[in-house]
Amino acid sequence: MTDGSAMTLRDEARAKVNLTLRVVGRRPDGYHELESVVAFADCADHLTLQPGAALSLTTIGPGAQDCGDSADNLVLKAARLLGERVPDLTTGAFTLDKHLPVAAGIGGGSADAAAALRLLARANDLAVDDPRLIEAARLTGADVPVCLPSKPCVMTGVGEKLSPLPLPRIPAVMVNPRVPVATKDVFTALGLKPGSLAVGATDVLAAPAWPEAGAPLADWVVALEAGTNDLEPPALKVEPVVGTVLEALRATAGVQLARMSGSGATCFALYADDASARAAADALCAAHPGWWVHAGSLS
């Protein structure tokens, strides 16, 4: 174990984006089985750890007031779960600089928790693939395992099965109308009963033939267009402004694909180049000054 009392460790909690999201069904225990292509954006929260101090969390930044009670934060939950599995775990004082919108379908809280686990792994000389770390991630929340590596993948099961995907860097715009959407409300609106399938008996579940490494961006757009986000219709029932965001994105010049991420309300659009993404973001900011808009890339 490393005595890290004199150093501050830093990590980024990158936003998670579901490029596709298919709800396969609902297990008897109530959890939903999913198939999702996941990428990560170049916008993030920032987390620091001062190892050796008592476990604590201070939240700062433009999104701090939206985080609620620090005692309920997933950063502390993840740290405590790891502490239950690693004897004499060195924890410390976390500071979360919150920039990503909350309850937004981009895994902000899950990304924060995953960053906390990565920082604790560094402070305690643990490998990021240590089974205890992975178990703590799984028990913290369904999106935490995919955020732990924060790399493009196909996510299946209830979020714990990850298959790497050679996704290229994709210019993109992300938009959130600053309206929180509770994941629980969206799944309730979906209305699947425990033990039921969302696919027909003749619908054979198989991994799509995704483009190989080095394939042009256009090939990936075509492959992603064949997918859906099954949570879009119920999210529109819960918060109709999602439809307004999608319409605005689909009306931008040069848009290749626009879709909702996760359970919303954040939506994204893909573009052929950075200039198109930047121009689209500028237009959206001008037309909707109250929205959160980010131009960057997914990878």
UniProtKB/Swiss-Prot annotation:
The pathway entry for this protein reads as: Isoprenoid biosynthesis; isopentenyl diphosphate biosynthesis via DXP pathway; isopentenyl diphosphate from 1-deoxy-D-xylulose 5-phosphate: step 3/6
Q: Give the matching SUPFAM superfamilies.
A: GHMP Kinase, C-terminal domain, Ribosomal protein S5 domain 2-like
Asked if the Swiss-Prot or TrEMBL record annotates the protein with the keyword Transferase, the reply is: yes
Q: Which Pfam families match?
A: GHMP_kinases_C (PF08544), GHMP_kinases_N (PF00288)
Q: What are its E.C. numbers?
A: 2.7.1.148
- Chain residues that bind ATP: 101-111
Q: Which reaction does it catalyse?
A: 4-CDP-2-C-methyl-D-erythritol + ATP = 4-CDP-2-C-methyl-D-erythritol 2-phosphate + ADP + H(+)
Q: Which GO terms describe its molecular function?
A: 4-(cytidine 5'-diphospho)-2-C-methyl-D-erythritol kinase activity; ATP binding
Instruction: Write down the top EC class of this protein.
Output: transferase
Q: Which positions are catalytic residues?
A: 16, 143
Q: Has keyword Nucleotide-binding?
A: yes
- Assigned keywords, A-Z: ATP-binding, Isoprene biosynthesis, Kinase, Nucleotide-binding, Transferase
GO terms under biological process: isopentenyl diphosphate biosynthetic process, methylerythritol 4-phosphate pathway; terpenoid biosynthetic process
Instruction: Give the highest taxon in the source lineage.
Output: Bacteria
- What task does this protein carry out? Catalyzes the phosphorylation of the position 2 hydroxy group of 4-diphosphocytidyl-2C-methyl-D-erythritol.
Q: Which NCBIfam families would you find in this protein's record?
A: ispE (TIGR00154), PRK14608.1 (NF011202)
Q: Which family does it belong to?
A: Belongs to the GHMP kinase family. IspE subfamily.
Query: What is the protein's name according to its record?
Result: 4-diphosphocytidyl-2-C-methyl-D-erythritol kinase
Task: Name its species.
Answer: Rhodopseudomonas palustris (strain ATCC BAA-98 / CGA009)
